[in-house]
Amino acid sequence: YHLIDAEMVSLDLHDRLEIAPGDSLTVVGPHGTETVGPDEDNLVRRALALAGRTASVTLHKQIPAGAGLGGGSADAAAVLRWAGFTDLRAAAALGADIAFCLVGGRARVTGIGEIVDPLPHDRRTFTIVTPPIFCSTPAVYRAWDEMGGPAGDNGNDLEPAALVVAPELVRWRDELADQTDRRPQLAGSGSTWFVEGAFPDVGRVVTTVPAYEWKRRGD
């Protein structure tokens, strides 16, 4: 495990889970099985095992996997909440942001993710860009360790390591910076970049990037 000190916030971007009696997992939607990974590795499966429950789950995947947005963690937290599971330390052992996803809102998260200190609500608008690049969180942390644990200069210490794992991220960062005249920040271990504000308006295209093949980095 790594010790973290992060500010986390809930977004109005979400997956949807249908839970019924049974023992199966089906992933559908625009960010389905081709990016989520093997069934046995899915955080929904692992959350069910942690809670000692079985269920038939249909996961409607809207949050890109490997984007640093905590989609898999939010799914796991939804299952744990359904099961009535409230042990934040055990939840954090599955993933560093799962305990936060159980609590939600806005918080400072420390330890291995099990210490969740709520912060005041702060309504803000962000523009996010999710490149078609899957950034493996374990791979980014490995790169960070191999680099000697460098500190980032823009609010996220994992950014230098993510750029080693997926150098293509630079192109997307620079394009967003050019279009917004702001320096983008990396979400989590990547691959999402974000800036504060709406450019030019909520729900509209910020910029068009030439066709780019979806890639998985750091398996």
Label each residue range with its predicted role.
Residues 2-7, 85-185, 196-219:
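ATP-dependent small-molecule kinase catalytic core of the GHMP/sugar-kinase superfamily
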Residues 67-92:
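DPxDG-like acidic metal-binding loop motif
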